Design a protein with these regions (language model features):
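Conserved beta-strand-loop-alpha-helix hinge in the C-terminal portion
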Residues: 215-233
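ABC family nucleotide-binding domain
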Residues: 2-211
Length: 233
């Protein structure tokens, strides 16, 4: 059985003549350990889909089966537990708490998970060993995003969801963040899903899903993913 199964998922906003189909009969499967890129233009429906996968939103209809459990049937309380225990989130904007140090920001997230990783080890793994006691305002943008990734990883989630994680970063820093995510996926066998409008990064993925007009336009596996260092855009 696939780790993620999305079956006939639609997300519809509005009613009557004023209806928006953000997702329209979406279907795909993701195997355990895959690094998946969901790519599409702005407004294609990819962030809506990511929110549904992360339990931050629910589909109007359809099934979202993750690790053999259909979260589309979950109550709000069950979805809160799912997000807390199983999912890590990385967004374009870092959402760090300004009056906590980098280390404290990550520690705060790790405290909500019963199976969290050693925070100092995670900080070292993301290249922030010497920035533990710095506040967010003292960090560069790429460093702040590394804190956000460490915060997500420290929970030891089965699923790491990343919505335009390099959108606010320069080219060089963005590549370093993508390498960090690729290394995390391949070293831990965890599932990482990256939502992006940048189709040039598709070669780094094990699995590529293209979204347009709320529908899956293409769904393919990549038998030979490239290291991020070999990709240019």
């Amino acid at each position: 059985m696939a780790y993620i199964e999305v079956k006939h998922v639609s997300k519809i906003y509005g009613s009557g003549e004023q209806v928006v189909r953000a997702n329209d009969d979406i279907n795909f499967e993701v195997q355990k350990g895959e690094l998946t890129i969901i790519v599409g233009a702005s407004g294609a429906g990819k962030s809506t889909l990511l929110n549904i996968l992360g339990g931050m939103d629910t589909p109007t209809k359809g099934d979202v089966i993750i690790n053999a459990k259909n979260i589309a049937d979950d109550s709000p309380k069950q979805l809160t537990t799912y997000r807390r225990l199983s999912v890590g989130f990385v967004f374009q904007f870092y959402n760090l708490i300004p009056n906590l140090t980098a280390l404290e920001n990550v520690e705060l997230a790790s405290q909500i998970s019963p199976d969290s990783l050693d925070v100092r080890t995670v900080m070292e793994d993301v290249g922030l060993k010497n920035r533990l006691n710095n506040f967010p305002a003292q960090l560069f943008g790429g460093e702040q995003q590394r804190v956000a990734i460490a915060r997500a990883i420290a929970k030891n989630p089965d699923l790491l969801l990343c919505d335009e994680p390099t959108g606010a970063l320069d080219y060089k820093t963005g590549k370093s963040i993508l390498k960090l995510l690729q290394d995390f996926s391949h070293k831990t066998d965890k599932n990482v899903i990256i939502v992006t409008h940048n189709g040039m990064i598709k070669p780094m993925a094990d699995h590529i899903i293209e979204i347009g007009d709320g529908q899956v336009k293409d769904d393919q596996l990549n038998a030979h993913p490239k290291p991020v260092e070999a990709i240019e855009w």
